[in-house]
Amino acid sequence: MENQKVPISSVPNLKELSRPIANFPPSIWGDRFINYACEDENEQAQKERQVEELKEQVRRELAATVDKPLQQLNIIDATQRLGIAYHFENEIEESLEHIYLHTYVENNCFQGSHDLYSVALWFRLLRQDGYKVSCDVFDKFRDYEDNFKNSLMEDAKGLLELYEATHLSVHGEEMLDDALEFAKTRLESIVNHLNYPLAEQVRHALYRPLRKGLPRLEAVYFFRIYEAYDSHNKALLKLAKLDFNLLQSLHKKELSDMARWWKSLDFAAKFPFARDRLVEGYFWVLGVYFEPQYSLARKIIIKVFTMISTIDDIYDAYGTLDELELFTKAMQRWDVGSLDQLPEYMKPCYKSILDVYNEIEEEMDNQGSLFRMHYAKEVMKKLVEGYMDEAKWCHEKYVPTFEEYMPVALVTSGYTFLTTISYLGMGEIASKEAFDWLFSHPPVIEASESVCRLMDDMRSHKFEQERGHVASGIECYMKQYGVTEEEAHDEFRKQLVKAWKDINEECLRPYRVPKPLLMRILNLTRVIDVIYKNEDGYTHVKKAMKDNIASLLIDPMIV
């Protein structure tokens, strides 16, 4: 932490102020993504034709397996893992409904298949699609003492699929909790004795199960794994690689446009104390939705994301309490006339927020969805109020109880805010009823916020305390309960398990809102697991984050 004295003439009675500067690392990307070289139109058109031809071939293969559920499940699994399931949403929906009705509702189990892999795959794919199939289907793999049978010990493929399936568990499914421990322990003991590619697949799953992985990032990893299996579907693999490259071109174009916009604002110079993280922010947004139909939605959320990241740092790492009070009041008024009442350094940020929202408002008006702006503004106001509450705690050196801390910290996690903004560009599916549901703070939102807040606090609290940050949940919990830091981490890990079960429960049918809206919440939660699993990868951009960004936005797939 470094204290700097900065004159602020526009704040009454303040001549020199001592500020705790966080010294965030600068952006590592520079202008790398500003320039975008468009692909030759003829080559682009040829690739698009190939994609359409391959899509038709895959559709025919799906249709041909209608009476072969295991083959159909394997094709569906591959399309999802390769990141191309969005092309076949209707076909996959119909196939899974057919499988559910004919193998579960009519028979109450997955008849005709007694191996662990097949049953676990069936269970996982149906659960992923919202069907609450019973975990009793795994009873056949347990002995009379309710332990999983010793005969499963060497079935690495089946154990891996069981391990993946257990991450779809909900509350009260102790069998799946036991199955997770059993599969995880056994896989850890045999992984070094397995051959490639299964060994690599097991290692990856033990680090990050499918349920917590970002679909686009998981696809990049799965390309080489899938290709290494002799049984891979060549049409699927080629389609996935071509589609990946076409989408990557679109994403690079979007990022190039955003990079020019961001540079024109010159926030890096105007707010040198704040994190300059446009590229990392765009990676975050790609985690929420990568599909081409959400291009407008991405452009909206990345602009707002960069604004709120700067505001967060103004509250956390620069502003005085008096200045922050002025900014908070200006946000509540939401009026360009409030500019005159702000310190000079705050004005560009406040003005840019209003400009971005005006731009979004014009787009919403064109779509006949102006009602969405009420929610977008209200959620911003509430977020800033939360930042102000934390700033007061920090100023007073107050350490709240964990129960007092969490309601504010869930707001400042920003995840209700980001979910709201993520809905703005999603078209008619984001109805007024959907926004009202979101603002009722349903369990799935609280769970998503909890994952964000708990993982953020676990990974960033030491750096934050070194620079004079508000007490994190770790400090609050340690002080209130008189426990060690490791004991606090253990409790947070238990709460993370609970939160993921809440999310799984809320993603089961019947859906309270359309599934695409729930997927934004699930994907936002997944982003946190990717960026904050071992460190705060957003603030301190190290190898893991660099590699993830490069894999999605720099390195094409070799077809």
From Swiss-Prot:
Binding site for Mg(2+) 1: 312, 316
EC number: 4.2.3.-
Alphabetical GO biological process terms: diterpenoid biosynthetic process; geranyl diphosphate metabolic process
Binding locations of Mg(2+) 2: 312, 316
Entry function: Sesquiterpene synthase producing the monocyclic sesquiterpene alcohol germacrene D-4-ol and helminthogermacrene and minor amounts of bicyclic compounds such as alpha-bulnesene, gamma-muurolene, alpha- and beta-selinenes, when incubated with farnesyl diphosphate.
Cofactor(s), names only, from the UniProt record: Mg(2+); Mn(2+)
Molecular function, one GO term: sesquiterpene synthase activity
Keywords: Lyase, Magnesium, Manganese, Metal-binding
Name of the featured protein: Sesquiterpene synthase
Lineage summary: Eukaryota, Viridiplantae, Streptophyta, Embryophyta, Tracheophyta
Family classification: Belongs to the terpene synthase family. Tpsa subfamily.
Organism: Santalum album
Cofactor note: Binds 3 Mg(2+) or Mn(2+) ions per subunit.
Binding site for Mg(2+) 3: 464
InterPro entries to which the protein is assigned, alphabetical: Isoprenoid_synthase_dom_sf, Terpene_cyclase_plant_C1, Terpene_synth_N, Terpene_synth_N_sf, Terpene_synthase-like, Terpene_synthase_metal-bd, Terpenoid_cyclase/PrenylTrfase
Sequence motif DDXXD motif, location on chain: 312-316
A Pfam family of this chain: Terpene_synth_C
PANTHER family xrefs: ALPHA-HUMULENE_(-)-(E)-BETA-CARYOPHYLLENE SYNTHASE, OS04G0344100 PROTEIN-RELATED
Top EC category: lyase
